[in-house]
């Protein structure tokens, strides 16, 4: 991993580089647990949040993944290299924060479902003030949002993904939700 030392709340915090994100989504999604999402606000203040819950969405074959319907203007960022943000609106009211993984033209993404003290993907983006303006932002070189490795280990649990009945039983039952307590 290309890591750059960053001052933080944790004994050693390291900014995560591109090679972390260009791996398969089923490797990256659990590896994101206990990583630190860092957000720099317009006033210069910086907040750090530990990731506690993720879900993997694995390309055009995954019926729950937005890319299952092919390449569109909405999903274009999913076809870019890992480390970019894919942000979209659901139900006309909640922004969803996803991190693109894999290589170019491998549309995979990890939904950030929870942070320490914030459970649920809509609550996460609302609490952090995240919206479409960060769609396509690159976590490896952005000065507004990035990830750090806290060096902390977690007991990671799995379960089927949430809220994807439309994808059918096969895809709904995949244990691609990762979380810790």
What are these regions (language model features)?
Residues 2-181:
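Conserved, well-structured core segments that form or line functional sites
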């Amino acid at each position: 991993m290309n890591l750059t030392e960053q001052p933080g709340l944790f004994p050693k915090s390291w900014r995560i580089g591109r090679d972390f994100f260009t791996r398969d989504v089923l490797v990256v999604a659990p590896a994101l647990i206990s990583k630190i999402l860092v957000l720099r606000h317009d006033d210069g203040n910086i907040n750090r949040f530990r990731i506690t819950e993720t879900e993997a969405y694995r390309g055009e074959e995954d019926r729950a993944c937005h890319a299952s319907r092919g390449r569109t203007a909405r999903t274009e960022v999913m076809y870019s290299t890992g480390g970019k943000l894919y942000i979209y609106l659901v139900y006309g009211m909640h922004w969803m924060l996803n991190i693109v993984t894999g290589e170019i033209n491998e549309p995979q993404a990890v939904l950030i479902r929870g942070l320490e003290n914030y459970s649920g993907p809509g609550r996460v983006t609302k609490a952090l003030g995240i919206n479409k303006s960060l769609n396509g932002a690159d976590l490896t070189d952005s000065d507004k949002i990035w990830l750090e490795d806290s060096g902390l280990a977690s007991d990671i649990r799995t379960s089927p993904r949430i809220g994807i009945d439309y994808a059918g039983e096969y895809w709904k039952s995949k244990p691609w939700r990762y979380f810790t307590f």
